[in-house]
C-alpha cells in the first residue's frame, strides 16, 4: 500500500507492506487523516513512534472498514474514525477495533478524520485526569488549535465557562464564536488573563515561559495539565505557590498509552461525547483540507501556527 513517510524533514508517498489484520483488529480503507503537531515533530525526526508502532505518519484517520479480524463486532462497510499510534496517512491501516468509533451523525467522512485525537485528548486530560466539575472555570492555551476547538465545545456542552489565549484577534473571535467566554492575544499582555481567573483547570500545550503565569492563574486546588512543550521544556517556578494553592501539575501523553487504556478511553467517548454530535452540540472544525499530493503544503499550513481548527489530508476522496 502507499503511505506517507517523513524522510529527512520531507514527506514521501512510498510503498509499504500491507499489514496483517489479526484478532480484534479491523482494516480501514482510509479516506482522510487529521494532522497533529506530533506529525510535524516526527517528520522532523524529533518524535519517533512508540516501540512497535508504524513508522508511517498519522495519529488519526477516517474511512471504511474493509476487513474484520476475529472477535471484533465491526462490519465490513462500516464508516468509522480511529485513533492510532501511527500509520493513518496511508491507503489503508490496521487498528485495534476498540480504538474505533462510528462516524457521528451529521458528520462527513472527511470531517470525521479531525475528531479522534482531539476529543480523546480533551476528554482524557480535562474530564478524566483533571476531573473537571460542573461550573469550574477552564483556561485553554492555544485555544484556536484543534484541541482547543474541541475543548471549547466540550466545556460549553458540560456547563463549564472557558477562556483562551491565542495568537491573533481573528483567532480570539473564532474561539468566542465556538463558545469561549473571552481571552487574550498572546502578543498583548498575557497577565491580563488574571482578570478572568483564577482557573480551576488549565490545559497547557505550551509550557516554557507560560509555566510561571499558570501558577499565578491557578485557583486553590487547581489542576494544571501539561500536554505539550511548544514554548520550550524549561521553566522557572515559584514552588511556594504550588504549596500555598495546593496546585496539581499533571503531565500527560496519549500516543504511548497501552491498548487497554485507549480502549477504555474510547468506551467513555462513545458514551459521553459521541452522542453530542447528533444533538448538534459538537461539530468538527476544519481549517483546511489538502489532497495527499499536497502533503508538504498541509504540513506547512499546520506549522504556520495561523490556522483555526484542524488541517486534514484527504487520502481517497472517492470514499466520501
Where are these predicted regions, by residue range?
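Glycine-rich phosphate-binding loop and adjacent beta-alpha segment
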Residues: 158, 166, 209-281, 314-320
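Glycine-rich NAD(P) Rossmann-fold beta1-alpha1 loop
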Residues: 119-120, 145-149, 208
Amino acid at each position: 500500500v502507499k503511505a506517507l513517510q517523513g524522510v529527512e524533514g520531507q514527506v514521501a508517498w512510498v510503498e509499504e507492506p500491507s499489514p496483517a489484520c489479526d484478532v480484534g483488529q479491523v482494516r480501514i480503507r482510509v479516506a482522510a487523516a487529521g494532522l497533529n503537531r506530533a506529525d510535524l515533530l516526527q517528520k522532523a525526526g524529533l518524535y519517533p513512534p512508540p516501540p512497535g508502532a508504524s513508522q508511517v505518519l498519522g495519529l488519526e484517520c477516517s474511512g471504511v472498514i474493509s476487513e474484520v479480524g476475529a472477535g471484533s463486532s465491526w462490519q465490513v462497510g462500516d464508516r468509522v474514525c480511529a485513533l492510532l499510534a501511527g500509520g493513518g496517512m496511508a491507503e489503508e491501516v490496521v487498528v485495534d477495533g476498540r480504538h474505533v468509533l462510528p462516524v457521528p451523525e451529521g458528520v462527513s467522512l472527511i470531517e470525521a478524520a479531525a475528531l479522534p485525537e482531539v476529543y480523546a485528548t480533551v476528554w482524557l486530560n480535562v474530564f478524566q485526569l483533571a476531573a473537571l466539575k460542573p461550573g469550574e472555570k477552564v483556561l485553554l492555551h492555544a485555544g484556536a488549535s484543534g484541541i482547543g476547538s474541541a475543548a471549547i465545545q466540550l466545556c460549553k456542552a458540560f456547563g463549564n465557562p472557558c477562556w483562551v489565549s491565542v495568537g491573533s484577534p481573528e483567532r480570539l473571535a473564532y474561539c468566542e464564536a465556538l463558545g469561549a467566554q473571552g481571552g487574550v492575544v498572546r502578543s498583548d499582555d498575557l497577565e491580563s488573563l488574571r482578570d478572568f481567573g483564577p482557573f480551576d483547570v488549565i490545559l497547557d500545550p505550551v509550557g516554557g515561559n507560560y509555566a510561571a503565569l499558570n501558577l499565578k492563574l491557578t485557583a486553590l486546588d487547581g489542576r494544571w495539565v501539561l500536554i505539550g512543550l511548544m514554548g520550550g521544556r524549561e521553566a522557572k517556578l515559584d514552588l511556594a505557590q504550588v504549596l500555598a494553592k495546593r496546585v496539581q501539575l499533571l503531565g500527560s501523553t496519549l500516543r504511548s498509552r497501552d491498548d487497554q487504556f485507549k480502549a477504555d478511553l474510547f468506551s467513555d467517548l462513545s458514551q459521553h461525547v459521541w452522542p453530542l454530535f447528533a444533538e448538534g452540540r459538537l461539530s468538527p472544525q476544519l481549517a483546511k483540507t489538502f489532497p495527499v499530493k499536497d502533503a508538504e503544503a498541509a504540513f506547512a499550513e499546520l506549522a504556520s501556527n495561523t490556522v483555526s481548527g484542524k488541517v486534514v489530508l484527504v487520502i481517497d476522496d472517492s470514499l466520501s
